[in-house]
Swiss-Prot record:
Belongs to the AIM32 family. Gene3D superfamilies: Glutaredoxin. This is Altered inheritance of mitochondria protein 32. Transmembrane segments: none annotated. SUPFAM superfamilies: Thioredoxin-like. InterPro entries: Aim32/Apd1-like (IPR009737), Thioredoxin-like_sf (IPR036249). Coiled coil: none annotated.
Length: 326
């Protein structure tokens, strides 16, 4: 059975068509009692160490929705100060977009300037801490450019503070501004003052705008594990343990693996985003990827989940939603 997912995002119903054909399956069936038991035992042990308001929710149905977006900008965290002082633990404050330190300050700046672009609402911005793969964390040099990996561009851009505004305009498909002398039409009058939509016009960006920003191509799959510890302790604990499990089981072969800041659904931790790189569209030259979001991923079921996805099967029990990109 080919799986096409229906969900409600931005108050609209949409159907996600993937570049690959996935089969929807259930893995917690009669033959997988051991896996079910291992997951229950793990959740129970973790919940015993957490206060009541921060326990994992193991009973409620998973929300069947993910953000609607076209691009994902991932700001790479700096190198760890030491093995005991992890950057994502110490410097990912709860509201990371308010962090004034470079390069994290670029997160809030990008979000602000993306509001004034054509497609800015379709761009997600997060921080990531690289664990393994073919990308390296930037140095702690205060003059270092911010390293930003953009999906589905599959490019690592290196952005200086003075380039932030133009880079945001590039990400968002061009700068927009309100028409200053907009005259109310009779149709506007009938709508009422509170319902008039401000008209905007697009300030054209050069078609080769990306050439102005130093970048490297990197076309491979990604595993992103939510580990925003200062936002929610559950993700901090599970993020670290899932990353350790990926390393211990060798699940990172030919993939980039990283911890990612807040992606929602903390009570359903652990949360994963998988970006499966499919290839390049022969007609458009654009990169094609499938974006798959999962929750309730624990060390006991992590390997089984990734094996199923590699076999083009989506486990219902953990699936939140997804879509194709490009």
């Amino acid at each position: 059975m080919v799986f096409h997912y229906r969900s409600i995002l931005k108050y609209q119903v949409f159907r996600a068509y993937f570049h690959r054909q996935y089969e929807q399956v259930r893995i917690h069936t009669g033959g997988s009692q051991l896996l079910t038991c291992d997951c229950q035992n793990y959740s129970s042990r973790l919940n015993q160490s957490l206060p009541n308001e921060f326990k994992l929710d193991v009973d409620s149905p998973l929300p069947s929705k993910v953000p609607s977006y076209k691009k994902h900008a991932l700001v790479l965290s700096l190198q760890n100060k030491s093995a005991d002082e992890l950057e994502w633990m110490t410097n990912w404050q709860s509201k990371l977009e308010l962090n004034p330190m470079w390069p994290y300050s670029i997160i809030g700046d990008l979000k602000t300037h993306l509001k004034h672009t054509k497609f800015g609402s379709d761009v997600l911005v997060n921080a990531i801490s690289i664990h393994s793969g073919n990308l390296s964390a930037p140095s702690r040099d205060p003059h270092e450019r911010a390293h930003i990996f953009v999906i589905p561009d599959m490019k690592l851009y290196k952005i200086s503070p003075q380039d932030v505004v133009s880079f945001a305009h590039f990400l968002g498909g061009g700068h927009t501004r309100q028409v200053a002398d907009h005259q109310l039409s009779f149709a506007d009058f009938l709508k009422g003052a509170d319902n008039v939509v401000n008209k905007t016009e697009l300030v054209s960006e050069p078609s080769n705008a990306d050439h102005a920003f130093p970048h490297e191509d990197c076309k491979r799959d990604w595993i992103l594990v939510c580990g925003h510890n200062q936002r929610d302790r559950r993700c901090g604990i599970l993020g670290k343990e899932l990353i350790n499990e990926i390393s211990a089981k060798g699940l990172d072969k030919d993939k980039n693996v990283a911890l990612i800041s807040h992606v929602g659904g903390h009570k359903f931790a652990g949360n994963l985003i998988l970006y499966n790189y499919v290839g390049t569209n022969e007609k458009t030259g654009e990169n094609q990827l499938d974006s798959l979001w999962f929750s309730r991923v624990l060390p006991p079921n992590l390997g089984t989940l990734l094996e199923h996805v590699d076999a083009k099967k989506i486990p219902q029990e953990y699936y939140r939603g997804g879509t194709s990109m490009n």
